[in-house]
């Protein structure tokens, strides 16, 4: 039983991180209807900014996380203004190519600044908690609490605030929202900023139990795409549920089958679920 609960803990940890990254990706897709491949680079940038603030400037963990969130929010907003907004009326292929260009540029910039080596981010929470025979590192408990707290905050923001309602309206019908006076440019910038914050927080939470390096966003963004396809493109509940499904599947698959197949499980689930429900678990649309 303890081993089973240990995998539940690991699944919640992975699922929380995957869901945060997928939420930012699905929000942007809901507004632009274009897969933002640069989102993986925003994740990587968040980890490097937090790492730099802690290692070079001596900032504590939470200040580094806040600094990374602000920096990546600004970076994502800048990318929206300079890259995605001018291509708003272009065919779907052009924004996709532009997003890949942003991804490659940011990875090259990170490698030029911090090098291609792997870096370890220290965590102030190195303790271990024993819960009913389950070994629970404090950092993993922090990831679970912070990730689900942030998901709840995003849900309340989208459902209970006027600004959040404008994001939902823009995702459902951009032309109609513009006709009733919603500023499309402002909503797009805000959505990119939120996606940047989610990516940076996810990276800063996960980096202490992983490694920081320029290509760290590749596998994460690939799985995030699997998640939003599983959950339904543009669906916020789908991103959360899909992230948890992939997190639990990887955790239990690695333990009961083999760690060699851990990363393949997500793609196997994608094929299985889409063969049964091609539209994904939830229907399209941010809500």
What would you call each of these model-derived segments?
Residues 47-51, 69-75, 102-110, 146-155, ...:
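Hydrophobic core segments of alpha-helical transmembrane domains in multi-pass membrane transport
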Residues 58-102, 109, 241-246, 277-278:
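Alpha-helical transmembrane segments within multi-pass membrane transporters and channels
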Residues 82, 113, 172-179, 183-186, ...:
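Cytosolic-side transmembrane-helix boundaries in multi-pass membrane proteins
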Residues 86-160, 187-190, 252, 257, ...:
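Transmembrane helix-bundle core of multi-pass membrane transporters
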Residues 28-78, 82:
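Membrane-embedded helix boundary and interhelical linker motif in transport proteins
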Residues 14, 135-212, 236-242:
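Helix-loop-helix "hairpin" substructures at the membrane interface of multi-pass membrane proteins
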Residues 18, 58-70, 189-199, 203-270:
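Transmembrane alpha-helical segments in multi-pass inner-membrane proteins
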Residues 1-21, 49, 56, 60-64, ...:
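Membrane-interfacial amphipathic/re-entrant helices at transmembrane-helix boundaries
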């Amino acid at each position: 039983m303890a081993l089973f609960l240990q995998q539940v803990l690991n699944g919640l940890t992975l699922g929380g991180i995957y869901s945060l990254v997928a939420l930012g990706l699905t929000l942007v897709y809901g507004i632009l209807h274009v897969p933002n491949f640069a989102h993986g680079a925003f994740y990587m940038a968040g980890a490097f900014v937090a790492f730099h603030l802690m290692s070079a400037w001596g900032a504590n963990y939470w200040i580094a996380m806040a600094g990374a969130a602000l920096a990546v929010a600004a970076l994502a907003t800048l990318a929206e203004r300079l890259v995605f907004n001018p291509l708003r009326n272009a065919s779907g292929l052009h924004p996709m190519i532009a997003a890949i260009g942003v991804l490659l540029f940011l990875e090259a910039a990170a490698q030029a600044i911090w090098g291609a080596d792997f870096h370890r981010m220290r965590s102030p929470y190195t303790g271990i908690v024993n819960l009913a025979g389950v070994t629970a590192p404090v950092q993993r408990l922090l990831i679970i609490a912070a990730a689900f707290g942030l998901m709840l905050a995003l849900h309340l923001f989208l459902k209970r605030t006027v600004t959040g309602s404008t994001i939902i309206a823009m995702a459902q019908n951009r032309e109609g929202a513009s006709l009733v006076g919603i500023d499309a440019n402002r909503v797009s910038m805000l959505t990119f900023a939120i996606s940047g914050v989610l990516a940076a927080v996810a990276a800063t939470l996960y980096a202490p139990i992983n490694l920081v390096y320029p290509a760290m966003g590749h596998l994460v963004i690939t799985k995030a795409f699997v998640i939003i396809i599983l959950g339904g493109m543009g669906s916020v509940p789908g991103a959360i549920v899909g992230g948890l499904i992939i997190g639990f599947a990887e955790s239990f698959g690695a333990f009961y089958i083999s760690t060699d197949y851990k990363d393949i499980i997500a793609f196997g689930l994608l094929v299985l679920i889409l063969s049964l429900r091609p539209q994904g678990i939830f229907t399209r649309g941010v809500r």
